Amino acid sequence: MLTSNKISSLVIDTLRKQTGEQNIAVIFLYCDYQAQKDQSAVNMIGSLVRQATLREPTILSEIKRAFDKSKREGGDGLQLPDMVKLFGKVSSYMEVVYLCVDAVDEMLPQHRLEFLRALQQILQDAPNVRLFLTGRPYIRAELDKYLTEKTYAMHIIADQGDITRYLRQKMDDNDDQDPGLMTEDLKNNIMATMAEKASEM
C-alpha cells in the first residue's frame, strides 16, 4: 500500500534519477503533525532555501549577507518575505527546481495558509520552479485559492483490497513472531476498523 510519504518518496527518487548531474534541483519537505509548532511558514521556506543552497553553493555569501543585515537591523532573523526572495535568487541559478511537499495538511492551519501564500509567490516569481504537493482532500479549497494557475490535481484513493492485503500481511508477520497473540475475531475487527477509517481519509 502506498501512503502519502511513500508516493512523495517515489516522486523524489524518480526525479533525482532522471535529472542526474544536470543543473536541476530536487528539494523536499515532509510535514508532520507531531512537529506542527516547528513548521511555521518561515521555517519551511528557510528549509527550502537551505536545500537549494546546498545544490548551488556559489550563492552562500549572498545568503550570509542577508542574514547578517537582518541581525544588524535588530531583527531575529529573516522574515518570510526575505526568505521567499532568497529562494527566488537561489533557484535562478538552476534550470529547474522541483519542490516536493508531502502532507501539507498536517501543518497548523495558520502556518499552512502562510506557507501556501509563500509558495504562490515563489511560483509567480520563479517560472523554473515546479511544485508537487500531497495533502488530504479537505484542504483542496485552500490549494485552489493559492495555487490555481497551471495546477493539476490527482485524487489518489486507497483501494480497499490493498488495505486488506497490507493489514493481513502485517498481522501474519506478527503471528510469525508471536503466535497466538491475536485471535481471528480480533484480526477481523482490526481489519474492518482500519478499512473503514481509511475510506474516511
Language-model-detected regions and their locations in the chain:
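Conserved NB-ARC/NACHT P-loop NTPase core of NLR-like innate immune receptors
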Residues: 1-201
